[in-house]
Curated annotation (Swiss-Prot):
Structure 4HLU is probably in the open state. It is a peripheral membrane protein. It comes from Thermotoga maritima (strain ATCC 43589 / DSM 3109 / JCM 10099 / NBRC 100826 / MSB8). The active site is at residue 157. One of its GO terms (molecular function) is ATPase-coupled transmembrane transporter activity. Forms a heterodimer with EcfA2. Forms a stable energy-coupling factor (ECF) transporter complex composed of 2 membrane-embedded substrate-binding proteins (S component, RibU, BioY), 2 ATP-binding proteins (A component) and 2 transmembrane proteins (T component) upon coexpression in E.coli. Stable subcomplexes with both A plus T components can also be isolated. This complex interacts with at least 2 substrate-specific components, BioY and RibU. GO terms for cellular component: ATP-binding cassette (ABC) transporter complex; plasma membrane. The keyword DNA damage does not apply. GO terms for biological process: riboflavin transport. This is Energy-coupling factor transporter ATP-binding protein EcfA1. Its main location: membrane. It is an enzyme of class 7 (translocase). ATP-binding (A) component of a common energy-coupling factor (ECF) ABC-transporter complex. Unlike classic ABC transporters this ECF transporter provides the energy necessary to transport a number of different substrates. Expression of the complex plus RibU in E.coli allows riboflavin uptake; uptake does not occur in the absence of RibU or the EcfA1A2T complex. Residues 3-230 form the ABC transporter domain.
């Protein structure tokens, strides 16, 4: 499945947050969206997930898609997993998204079992979600979206509140979902444990001004991309020594990562 954005814009209180955005997202791929705070990253994810109605054209496999159709095909996962906990047990939390679809109990049980296996939560069906670790809560949020048989996941800083081992767990889940044919679109700058991303999109002033591989991204210069983020990518490319030479010669000093 492919989502196509054609001259998509979004205004808030009359001011453009996104303007004339053109992009394509395919299943079986991982897309990382970067840019400074307020550049429109979260707005883009919410438009893709059908949570905001935008100007312009959005297509699913070439056919026009309204927000309702997007919500059926794109699951949105918030930064704070606790904000999505609804049920008193893990299985009830997943079941909630299925009940509103009108599925019978047999089909619900099959889907719950499948998605909990996919995210590594088998055996915790009767647990209180509030007692789960941060990483487990985030996996539960992902499972709840997958239970609806969404083709894409849009995740807004899904690991920013987690410790490194939990970050690794979440990225391993996302990579396995990519291999299952899901499309993954996420905002993050925590890249140490994400080994299988396909594309990086850079947003500046509400417009996507770059979409390409991370090898291509590190060769470009962006005023709002901080040195620690570049360092992570150079390390992934196996070019860290070359990057350090550039860094030392530039006279720059490392600053806090803001992408």
């Amino acid at each position: 499945m492919k989502i196509t954005l054609n001259s998509v814009s979004f205004r808030y209180n009359g001011d453009y947050v996104l303007k004339d955005v053109n992009a394509e997202f395919e299943t079986g791929k991982i897309y990382v969206v970067v840019g400074k705070n307020g550049s429109g990253k979260t707005t883009l994810l919410k438009i893709l997930a059908g949570l905001l109605e935008a100007e312009g054209e959005i297509f699913l496999d070439g056919s026009p898609a309204d927000p309702f159709l997007l919500r059926k095909n794109v699951g949105y996962v918030f930064q704070n997993p606790s904000s999505q906990i609804i049920g008193a047990t893990v299985e009830e939390d997943v079941a909630f998204s299925l009940e509103i679809m009108g599925l019978d109990e047999s089909e619900m049980r099959k889907r719950i079992k499948k998605v909990l296996e996919l995210v590594g939560l088998s055996g915790l069906e009767k647990e209180d979600p509030l007692n789960l670790s941060g990483g487990q809560k985030q996996r539960l949020a992902i499972a709840s979206m997958l239970a609806r048989d969404t083709r894409f996941l849009a995740l807004d800083e899904p690991v920013s509140m987690l410790d490194p081992p939990s970050q690794r767990e979440i990225f391993q889940v996302l990579e396995s979902l990519k291999n299952e044919g899901k499309g993954i679109i996420l905002v993050t700058h925590e890249l140490e444990y994400l080994d299988d991303m396909d594309f990086i999109l850079h947003i500046s002033n509400g417009t996507i001004d770059f979409c390409g591989s991370w090898e291509e991204f590190v060769e470009r210069e962006f005023d709002d991309v901080e040195i620690p983020f570049k360092w992570k990518l150079w390390k992934k490319c196996g070019k860290i020594n070359l990057w350090e030479d550039r860094y030392e010669n530039s006279g720059n000093q490392r600053r806090r990562d803001t992408v």
